[in-house]
Amino acid sequence: MIKKEMLAMILAGGQGTRLKILTKNNAKPAVPFGGKYRIIDFTLSNCSNSGIDTIGVLTQYEPHILNSHIGIGSPWDLDRKRGGVSILPPHMRNDGGNWYMGTADAIYQNIMFIDKYDPEYILVLSGDHIYKMDYSKMLQFHKEKNSDATIAVIDVPIEEASRFGIMNTNDDDKIYEFEEKPEQPKNNKASMGIYIFNWKILKEFLIEDSELEDSDHDFGKNIIPSLLDSGYNLYAYSFNGYWKDVGTIESLWQANMDLLDTKNPLDIYNKNWKIYSVSPSKPPQYTGPNAIIQNSLVVEGCAVFGKIQNSVLFPEVEVGSNSIIQDSVIMSNVKIGQNVIIRKCIIGSNTIIENNSVIGNSDDITVIGDGEKIKTNSIIKN
């Protein structure tokens, strides 16, 4: 048995239906972000930077791209003989098997994997949020409070609090009540879906919950309320940095645009907290003689002959002469012809946009899926 103080379990099986065609053939955590990343890179990098070297990634919906991206974990220094990263899909057991039926059930189905490391603590994470957090500081808080379960929270506008699970706390941050999406929230401390549990206690509750036919097998709906009802010590750990749930087209687009703000607290350029990813070998970016690039992220392999403003371009995007790209996210290997206008769009990978086309407007966000071909002189405005 390999003893680990704490290991991380990343919930990465979400379908992300609100991202529409962007997750048609792709799990939400594997959606491209920020020119060179995938969403899950932030959670994996947080683990690596926090000194966590044993991670289980729980996959389910369309896992192929995600599995290939993570591989053996080399970009995050997780290619290890003792620990490292393990992909954990639903599987058949002697007593049967099923899809993960909820967040808690996903952990329950992997009790044997966790017990192999005999951890004191288990860190449960979502693989589909954009943020940077030092989990070691959260663990220190957990220990200092002698907590049985610690939940990371972030202050949200009170008018939006009804969209979240809300933690009602005493002055010492001890949670006395949890409300799942309350109609009239008492405060604005929203759960971030980041939990640290004492493993022996959580294991007991997971086993009990698995036997309840009327349970949703969910941390927010079942496990957290049960712990509170049983008198265990639960504390809220406040997080003050940038955090974005990119579960909608609007939030994904906005999070990409946030990277263009020099005052953005996410700061992907911080050398002390790098965001790691798989980095394909591409040639340098080429900027044509009449090209203009303003306030944009344009990465390796791109060839720009037109005008780029307030946009994010992934590898190997080609932009023809006299074309204008504004307020848009252009994913990898997109070929854009001449005299094309693209405004406030998300364009999926491997798409071809032929000459003289107009896509998007300045109001709503227009989304074009992967591998589409937009013919010459097309006009698409949602």
Swiss-Prot record:
Report the coiled-coil segments. Answer: none
Subunit-structure text:
Homotetramer.
* GO BP annotation list: glycogen biosynthetic process
Query: What's in the keyword line of the UniProt record?
Result: ATP-binding, Carbohydrate metabolism, Glycogen biosynthesis, Glycogen metabolism, Nucleotide-binding, Nucleotidyltransferase, Transferase
Gene3D superfamilies referenced in this protein's UniProt entry, alphabetically: Hexapeptide repeat proteins (2.160.10.10), Spore Coat Polysaccharide Biosynthesis Protein SpsA, Chain A (3.90.550.10)
- PROSITE patterns per record: ADP_GLC_PYROPHOSPH_1, ADP_GLC_PYROPHOSPH_2, ADP_GLC_PYROPHOSPH_3
Task: Tell me the PANTHER family matching this sequence.
Answer: GLUCOSE-1-PHOSPHATE ADENYLYLTRANSFERASE, GLUCOSE-1-PHOSPHATE ADENYLYLTRANSFERASE-RELATED
What are the EC numbers? 2.7.7.27
- Provide the reaction this enzyme catalyses: alpha-D-glucose 1-phosphate + ATP + H(+) = ADP-alpha-D-glucose + diphosphate
Q: Does the keyword Coiled coil apply?
A: no
Alphabetical list of Pfam families matching this protein? Hexapep_GlmU, NTP_transferase
Gene Ontology MF terms in the entry: ATP binding; glucose-1-phosphate adenylyltransferase activity
Per its record, how is this protein called by name? Answer: Glucose-1-phosphate adenylyltransferase
What's the family? Belongs to the bacterial/plant glucose-1-phosphate adenylyltransferase family.
Query: InterPro entries of this UniProt entry?
Result: ADP-Glc_PPase, ADP_Glu_pyroP_CS, GlgC_bac, GlmU/GlgC-like_hexapep, NTP_transferase_dom, Nucleotide-diphossugar_trans, Trimer_LpxA-like_sf
Q: What is the protein's species of origin?
A: Clostridium novyi (strain NT)
- CDD domains linked to this entry: ADP_Glucose_PP (cd02508), LbH_G1P_AT_C (cd04651)
Q: Which NCBIfam families does the UniProt record give?
A: glgC, PRK05293.1
Class of enzymatic activity (EC top level): transferase
Q: In which pathway does it act?
A: Glycan biosynthesis; glycogen biosynthesis
Do you know which HAMAP family this protein is assigned to? GlgC
Function, in words: Involved in the biosynthesis of ADP-glucose, a building block required for the elongation reactions to produce glycogen. Catalyzes the reaction between ATP and alpha-D-glucose 1-phosphate (G1P) to produce pyrophosphate and ADP-Glc.
Residues annotated as binding alpha-D-glucose 1-phosphate are: Y100, G165, E180, K181, S191
